[in-house]
Every structure is written in C-alpha cells, then in structure tokens.
Amino acid sequence: MFIFKLIRYAMEMQLIVLLSIYCKLFNIDKTSKQIGLLSRKLGPKLGISKRANQNLLKAIPTLNKRKRLEIIRDMWENLGRTSAEFFNIKTLIKEKSRINIKGREILEENKNNGVIYVSGHIANWEIIPIAIKEVDHLVGAVFRESNNYFFNKWMIQQRKLITEHQFPKGPSGTKEILNFLKDGGSVAMLVDQKLSNGVKANFFGLNAMTASTPASLSLKYGYPVVPLKVKRKNGVNFEIEFFDKIEIDKTGNIDTDILNFTNKINLFLEKIISDKPEEWFWLHNRWDKRFN
C-alpha cells in the first residue's frame, strides 16, 4: 500500500514539475491567463466541484444555481492563475508595481513590533509576505504540510523565495511563531480552513472549527492581530489592504475571549469573501457535519 502511495505521489510531483517548467518558458501574464482558462474549463467538471456548490449553498443560500455555477467557474480560473503565478513567483517579487498596497501606514506602525497578519485563501494569497516585506523585512508565514512528501519539500523550497521563515501548523509551529514574534517578527496566517483542534466558531452562520492561535497569542501575550484582504485586479495585478487591529471587550474568561476574538476574525473573512466570492477557495471541507 505504501509503495502505491509513493508511486502516486511521485507521479503527481512529475506533473507539477512539468507545469512549472512550462510556466517558466513564458511571461507570467501569458501563463496565468492560459492556466486560468484551462482550469476554468476543466475544474467545474471534477467531482470536488460538488463540494464547492454545497459550500455555497450553506454559506450564501440566497444564490441561485446559475450564480453558483458562475462563481465556481471563476473560482477555478483564479486557482489556475494563482498556481501559474506561484511558479513564476520571482516575477511578482521583482515587479513591485503589480501589487498596490493600501493601509501602508498600518504596516509602518507595526514594523519590528511582533504582529500577526490574518487573511484567507483569497485571490493570490501567496503575495501576502511579499507585500509585508515592502515595509517589514522580518516576515514569516504559516503553512499546512501536504500529504505528498515530494510536493511538500518542493513547496518549502519554492516559498523560500518569498520568506525564509516558515512555520508548520500545530503545537510545534506555535512555539516557533511565539519565539519569532518575541524577536519582533511579523507572521502571516491563513485562518479560513478547518482546524480540528481549533475552536468551534461562527462562520457564515454555521459552526466551523477554526484556528485559535491568533486570538490566543494576542490575548495572552499582547501581539496585535491585523486583518488584510487581497484582490485580483486586471490579470496579474493585485491590491492588498491592511485594516486596523482586531479588538474585543474582554470578559475575564480566557476561553470566552478567545472564542469572541476568533468570531471577530471570521466575521472579517465573511465580509471579504462575500465581496468577491469567486476569489475564495470553496473546495475546502470547511463545515463539519457533526457540528451543523
């Protein structure tokens, strides 16, 4: 069984390498558009798109079938574009004019002070550390390890082009994050996916197991949590906006405060997802049936 899994992982990695080579043969605008259109055509036909449809029904029940299908097609195009752009990440690092930063003063205010930036898998989320490094050079990012050993090693090396400081999700990663924050570093976290050992928070009116790390680190150690949103603008151009730090009225009960804080983060995510639902990753198994 292990051998078959290893073979499958190796074949998957070969496809990724071939796609990477192809994307690097041409400029980022061309490959982003091509892979985006290919994903738009093929993606909706995959079985996993049923989950995206179900998630849309749960989160935004007012949408009719036609609108849901339109969002799913657009979502796949964005995912294709994001993948192609990741293979050409050096271009996004070099061509700074492609990323317009709003709320730069918030970055300046928190520079070298230890801050947690939170967002979700929206538009091209990989550009977040690139934008932060425009002002604050000590930036780290949290990542979820892939089951595919080969792909995981490749992703870590590829992300080193963006930041040397990478932290795995989980208890060991949290310790590393805390030490990094103590040294004045900034950490970017995507907190929109299900985390089984998180807290049961509200997300689009449903119970969703959510990472409590940002809330916990902020409430226990005083590190600010700054939300941000990324928007795709005209192909391979982006706008990233930073907002005021999240604050709550403390109750004196740490568990209650962590939940309230996490709910506030989720409310922010709801707003930016609702603004451009076609740019969010609807394929994730976000809502556990056991809790809804």
Identify what each model region corresponds to.
Residues 48-51, 148-149, 208-211:
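Active-site metal-coordination segments of metallo-dependent hydrolases
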Residues 93-100, 144, 163-169, 203-205, ...:
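Short, flexible loop segments at the rims of nucleotide/cofactor-binding pockets, characterized by
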Residues 113-171, 196-199, 232:
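Catalytic core of membrane glycerolipid acyltransferases/transacylases, capturing the structured
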Residues 97-101, 122, 148, 167-171, ...:
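A conditional alpha-helix N-cap/helix-loop micro-motif detector
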